[in-house]
Amino acid sequence: MIPVLPVSAQAGRLNEFIAQVNDYDCERIFTPIPDAEMVISITGDSMTPEYVNGCRVLVKRIDDRAFIDWGKTYVLDTASGVVIKNIFPTSDPATVRCVSVNPAYPAFEVQAKDIYAWYKVLMSMTMK
C-alpha cells in the first residue's frame, strides 16, 4: 500500500510537505504498480483530457541526473510550487520546457536549479 498525500499538484513545496506529514495522516491505497511510491491529486484543467481535475496520479521519484524520459509526464516540485506537465529539453541544458496537454495553456520554461524533485507519473486514476 502507498500513501495518498493530502496535497495536490500546484500547491506548495512537495518535499517540505512530505517531511512534515505523518504516515498516519495519509489515506493508503493498494497499487497495481509495484514501483509507485505515492499518490498525488491533480487540480485544474491544464492537463485535460489526459489528467482531469480531481484525478489521482501514482508517481515515483526519479534521479534527474541519471535519466529523464523526455516528452513524458512528470510532477515537478519547484520553487513556484508543484506542477504536473509533459517535460521537454530546451537548447539550454539549464532549463526544461513544461507543456500542458490542454492547448489553452501556454508552455513555459523552468530553471533546473529551481526543480527540487522529479516524480514520474506511472498511472492515473479517475473516479466515475
Model-derived features with residue positions:
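Glycine- and charge-enriched low-complexity intrinsically disordered segments
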Residues: 86-128
